[in-house]
Amino acid sequence: MDPPTPDPTRLSEGGWTLSREEAETVYESLGVSVTAHTVVYEDADLRERIVEAGGEDRVWRFFFASRLDITPSPGFGMVSAARPYVVRESKETFADELRDRGFEDVAHGDTETVRIEGFRARMTPHRARLSVDGTDVRILGAVVVWHDGDFHVAGGAYPASGLEALVDVDADAYETELLELIRAVA
């Protein structure tokens, strides 16, 4: 099974570059195995602008998309039973990813139902903080889970404020683009 393929035109026009592609077993117990096939992209243009302005060289904005390979494949009735577990684990894994990237005070908001290409999806917003040279950078993001025959998990994070001394950030535009990228995975 391959990872999902986000719209390559949208990615290149937005300055996104592939930073990682992997297949990782995320769960294995009681005869069930779950492998996440994932691609991760970063906003290389934003990173370059921040470095040129004297800021830290790091990933500031990222987007990921995963397709879950569940073996044995859950039957029709089992998808509904598995969905809450997949949503819960995806929220926690995304929060751990933010912490691994050095973000602090990671918290998630209430999960809500949204539509992704006609499929019911569960979206959970996240927020965090990144301390850079004595300044707090506010980070916002989201993780979305849906099932269209396969379980998909997609999301990302972006700076919402705190970088104004280096570059202009447009949190509303970043949020809009993140949601468009997620929808383009379907």
Show where each model-derived region lies.
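Surface-exposed amphipathic alpha-helical segments
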Residues: 154-186
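Short Lys/Arg-enriched alpha/beta "domain-start" segment
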Residues: 11-12, 81-86, 90-99
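A composition-biased, non-transmembrane "mature-region" signal
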Residues: 1-3, 64-65, 69-73, 152-153, ...
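Secretory targeting signatures
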Residues: 1-11
